[in-house]
């Protein structure tokens, strides 16, 4: 790869205000590709919403409705990376905000070093997640599956 830079990815550099604004605008667009699921303050999820979760190809789709509710409600508010239980190949990003009663789920796919989120190409997982974290004002929390 040599000294070539891929697009504008510069690790360990401080972004300008203009770049941050551009990233913020991109993130607003990116958030639209997430599958939003509404949850009640009690942690209960409507049957229609549970059906939608199962149709996402979500890795918990084989679990019972109660297990899905318990798993999602037990997480604190924040942004998570979750791996597929069975294969550890699929990675999902989950953003939970109980105050607003919402849950965003998007599937991440890696092809070589490129990152695809719900089929859309991103040049850097690190940049995407940092932007996501800044936008939602939540720290990233990585799950421990093993």
UniProtKB/Swiss-Prot annotation:
UniProt keyword list: Early protein
Induction data: Expressed in the early phase of the viral replicative cycle.
InterPro entries: SH2_dom_sf
Domain of life: Viruses
Keyword Isomerase: no
Intrachain disulfide bonds: none
Keyword flag Mitochondrion: no
Family to which the UniProt record says this protein belongs: Belongs to the asfivirus MGF 100 family.
Purpose: Plays a role in virus cell tropism, and may be required for efficient virus replication in macrophages.
UniProt-recorded name of the protein: Protein MGF 100-3L
Native organism taxonomy: Viruses, Varidnaviria, Bamfordvirae, Nucleocytoviricota, Pokkesviricetes
